[in-house]
């Protein structure tokens, strides 16, 4: 195997180019240029993963890696109750203004009552396993290419609505490759989420 490390796009991405070539694109320690933290939100990169860095451990020909957040180094994913996200989107004047300027962006108000849970696994790669159970019953997990609501609230809205500036490119951003969804049976059920890396 030939691994190589790249950066600059501020997102975490592991791409297996072929059977022997692996690209590790590492998100920046500054995330989205420190801007999400400046707004008293969590420090996030454009993939809505936390600011951080990668750690590579090499033992002979064997290599392992992990992503370490500057906030909680052991945390590898975040889950969202989309019923609660829909409530926030419905009540927020800032969200309404943002969506009025960018109607092509995902309107999470439509998630109300669906009992969906989003899971953002920021260093996900196809060799990882994501298992979600509800009362001992395994739920189907689907990968979804959409935007992360926390990043919209923490970065896009403060950089547009709060400043009264509406960059054209904000209408085309947002799709994340590290988001997964499950459907819970009800709004108050408990889910157990387990993410296992390739090691």
Task: Give names to the regions the model predicted.
Residues 90-199:
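Long, low-complexity serine/threonine/glycine- and acidic-rich segments characteristic of extracellular
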């Amino acid at each position: 195997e030939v691994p190589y490390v790249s950066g600059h796009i501020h997102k975490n991405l592991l791409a297996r180019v072929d059977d022997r070539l692996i690209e590790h694109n590492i998100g920046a320690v500054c995330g989205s240029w420190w801007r999400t933290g400046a707004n008293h939100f969590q420090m996030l990169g454009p993939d809505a993963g936390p600011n951080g860095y990668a750690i590579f451990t090499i033992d002979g020909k064997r290599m392992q890696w992990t992503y370490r957040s500057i906030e909680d180094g052991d945390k590898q994913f975040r889950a969202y109750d989309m019923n609660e996200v829909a409530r926030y989107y419905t009540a927020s004047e800032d969200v309404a203004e943002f969506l009025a300027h960018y109607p092509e962006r995902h309107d999470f108000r439509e998630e109300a009552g669906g009992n969906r849970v989003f899971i953002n696994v920021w260093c996900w790669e196809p060799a990882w396993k994501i298992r979600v159970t509800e009362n001992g019953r395994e739920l189907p997990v689907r990968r979804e290419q959409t935007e992360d609501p926390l990043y919209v609230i923490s970065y896009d809205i403060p950089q547009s609505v709060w400043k009264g500036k509406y960059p054209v490119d904000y209408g085309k951003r947002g799709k994340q490759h590290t988001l997964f969804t499950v459907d819970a049976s009800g709004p108050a059920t408990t889910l157990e989420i387990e993410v296992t890396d390739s090691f």
